[in-house]
């Protein structure tokens, strides 16, 4: 899991920084000057070496952009100052994009931008990732490429990643059950107070990725792309809680065979391969897969009893078994009662 640390607590001698030194003359001096500033990092739990580093900086409308061509017009921006991820197959880049978007929301910026070289494979891979999530090439800052991402509330159903994390309240909304055994494994940011963060330290692709996979055999109704999912961790009258909001990116029914199904699910699903095979072989009626983007974890969890009191659920027997439709008003009730920051929702 990423940690937020002051520069002064990060080992500048780590080999991780060698390429940054090569690319930026004076990197060490800049780093030491930032002693009290904070950066986001992840560390390899086996050897203590750095795997990723991210430094963010807020900029006002009066910022001088004369060293960027064409010059950026005045806006409130979030600058992705230093961003490096070692490719280890665990989707750390996506994990850090989530941090970037969360900071952009919190600071109510108009735009995010990043300056990046395209000399190395890891940089080209990062550029490709940024482009997948809506960053577009703007111009140059010396030899560095500049990419910008508009951050005004907007939702493009045909390409949800390009307008992530914004979602419209006018979409259909479903409550979806998820068993306790799988809940925090798939949605680690929604960890319960009763669970130990130490159990979720290791890197797995399904934990880090914004894009995740939910395998289902539920009868209709089924959601469609752009619909909102509210995840409900099962556990009975007092212990069942709504924890998380996601948005449906894609539904897939038409797998050629078992291996096609496994390949599609592998990186975004909490299930190991043998469990996925078991699910496929269980019945002649094959499962379908909902690919969704994780949006937000509720700061305050409300349980089944409260959902019944609020008339979101009609009673104990109304607990979601498949995709349970709720109204937009009921979603607003959940957002209010969970004390959520709703700045990612377009009303």
Stretch-by-stretch model annotation:
Residues 103, 109, 115, 124-193, ...:
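Contiguous surface segments at macromolecular interaction interfaces
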Residues 240-252:
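Short beta-strand-centered aromatic/proline hotspots
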Residues 1-43, 180-204:
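Short amphipathic alpha-helix that is part of the acyltransferase structural core
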Residues 90-105:
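Conserved acetyl-CoA-binding loop-helix of GNAT-fold acetyltransferases
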Residues 81-92, 118-119:
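A short, internal acetyl-CoA/4′-phosphopantetheine-binding micro-motif in the GNAT/acyltransferase core
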Residues 219-235:
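Short coil-to-beta transition motif at edge beta-strands of beta-rich domains
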Residues 61, 249-257:
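Short, conserved beta-turn/loop elements at beta-strand boundaries and strand-helix junctions
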Residues 47-79:
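Conserved acyl-donor/pantetheine-binding loop and adjacent beta-alpha core of acyl/acetyltransferases
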